[in-house]
Amino acid sequence: MKQLSVIDRILLLFTAILAAYQIAVGIDGADAVPLWAYTTGFGVLLLAGLLLLIFGFDCLKSPLVVVVSTLIPLALSVGLVWEYLPAWRVPYALFAGAGFGLVVLTRLAGAGRGATITLALVHGVAGLTIFGLPLLLSLRGDVAPGFALVGIGGGLIGLGGLLLLFLKLGRPVLSPRMILTVLPALLLLTLSAFVAG
């Protein structure tokens, strides 16, 4: 597996610092549930950046990484839905909880194709929510235009997740080396878009 370069380490360090910054400053005016959800999402991004920085890309081989990384899109999407779609709060929170539970169960059971389908479904719905909701709200004028950057960040993290998923399935879209080369920059760009939005 590709070793971390100095540039990779610098990008991951800035990613971790940016995630820590967002956790420390919080989200202005957010209620308790969205604040908890965003803090969880950024906390897992902080942890991911630090683990990659310390252990290198080898830590991506751990099955636990798949389970823990599921918290990122689920937490961020729960925060967005709770904050901007009040009628969907409970149904979406139930989906997120059940989806996370299914990802854990299918990974523990080693369910092969079932685990992959479950992961793709849960990540897909959460990822589309993070990507689409901020863009829609910005286009409708419900929020400041800059909030669209959150959607762009959602698209970037979704792209990174898909690249890693296909790599893990043994069917990478790009060469494994190329995926690992772009991953640190993709994480930093994602977090930059989230924080700026």
Name these PLM-found stretches.
Residues 51-90:
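Hydrophobic/aromatic-rich structural module bridging two neighboring secondary-structure elements via a short loop
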Residues 1-60, 181-182, 191-196:
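N-terminal topogenic module of multi-pass integral membrane proteins
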Residues 26, 48-61, 103-116, 162-173:
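C-terminal ends of transmembrane helices
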Residues 32-44, 66, 86-98, 144-157:
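Structural signature of hydrophobic alpha-helical transmembrane segments
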Residues 80-142:
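Membrane-proximal helix-loop-helix units in multi-pass membrane proteins
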Residues 24-34, 78-92, 133-148, 193-197:
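Helix-coil boundary and interhelical linker segments in multi-pass alpha-helical membrane proteins
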Residues 60-72, 91-96, 116-125, 175-183:
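Cytoplasmic-side transmembrane-helix entry/capping segments in multi-pass membrane proteins
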Residues 153-197:
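C-terminal transmembrane-bundle signature of multipass membrane proteins
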